[in-house]
């Protein structure tokens, strides 16, 4: 199998791995930006730590690293359009994305999306280059949880809502 063919097969296989949709944001002296990401997972709960993978060619990397802090906003099922904005699918400029009325600053000064299922603010503790991506290890310092909403996942290169079934009365 050729390298390009293997890469495409791998990408097709990963498209079968359903993943939560997140917008990873940062703000500080290096600027303000954000990116839609599905390569996000917990590392440990003691201390709370998360891993975020971003393509090494992304223009966001110098901003994330320069600020040293970020927020992982776990999107709800009604925030697909915002995911599309931050994935660059709509042509909306970066600053315009943050001019929407749904943003507030968290305790660490990071952009937190109102209505997201969770907002995890943290400090970047380590950055590793692995192949085509940078892997950020993030020490979580502040957690904002919402009790409302259903999930949003990316599966087979499309967004899908994940709805909780209503529990039957006992």
UniProtKB/Swiss-Prot annotation:
Keywords: Aromatic hydrocarbons catabolism, Flavoprotein, FMN, NAD, Oxidoreductase. The keyword Chloroplast does not apply. The keyword Flavoprotein applies. Its EC number is 1.5.1.36. It holds the Pfam family Flavin_Reduct. Pathway: Aromatic compound metabolism; 4-hydroxyphenylacetate degradation; pyruvate and succinate semialdehyde from 4-hydroxyphenylacetate: step 1/7. It catalyses: a reduced flavin + NAD(+) = an oxidized flavin + NADH + 2 H(+). GO terms for molecular function: flavin reductase (NADH) activity; FMN binding; NAD binding; oxidoreductase activity, acting on NAD(P)H; riboflavin reductase (NADPH) activity. GO terms for biological process: benzene-containing compound metabolic process; pyrimidine nucleobase catabolic process. InterPro entries: Flavin_Rdtase-like_dom, HPA_mOase_red, NADH-dep_flavin_reductase, Split_barrel_FMN-bd. Homodimer. 4-HPA 3-monooxygenase consists of a reductase component HpaC and an oxygenase component HpaB. Belongs to the non-flavoprotein flavin reductase family. HpaC subfamily. Catalyzes the reduction of free flavins (FMN, FAD and riboflavin) by NADH. Subsequently, the reduced flavins diffuse to the large HpaB component or to other electron acceptors such as cytochrome c and Fe(3+) ion. This is 4-hydroxyphenylacetate 3-monooxygenase reductase component. The gene is hpaC.
């Amino acid at each position: 199998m050729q390298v390009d063919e293997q890469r495409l097969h791998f990408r097709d296989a990963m498209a079968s791995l359903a993943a939560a949709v997140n917008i990873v944001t940062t703000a500080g002296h290096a600027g303000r930006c954000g990116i839609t990401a599905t390569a996000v997972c917990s590392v440990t709960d003691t201390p709370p730590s998360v891993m975020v993978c971003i393509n090494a060619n992304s223009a966001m990397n110098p901003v994330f690293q320069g600020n040293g802090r970020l927020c992982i906003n776990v999107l709800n099922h009604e925030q697909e359009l915002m995911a599309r904005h931050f994935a660059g699918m709509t042509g909306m400029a970066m600053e315009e994305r943050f001019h929407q009325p749904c943003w507030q600053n968290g305790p660490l000064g990071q952009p937190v999306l109102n209505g997201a299922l969770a907002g995890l603010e943290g400090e970047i503790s380590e950055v590793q280059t692995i192949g085509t991506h940078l892997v950020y290890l993030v020490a979580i310092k502040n957690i904002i949880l919402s009790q409302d909403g259903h999930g949003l996942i990316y599966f087979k290169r499309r967004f899908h809502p994940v709805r909780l079934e209503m529990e039957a009365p006992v």
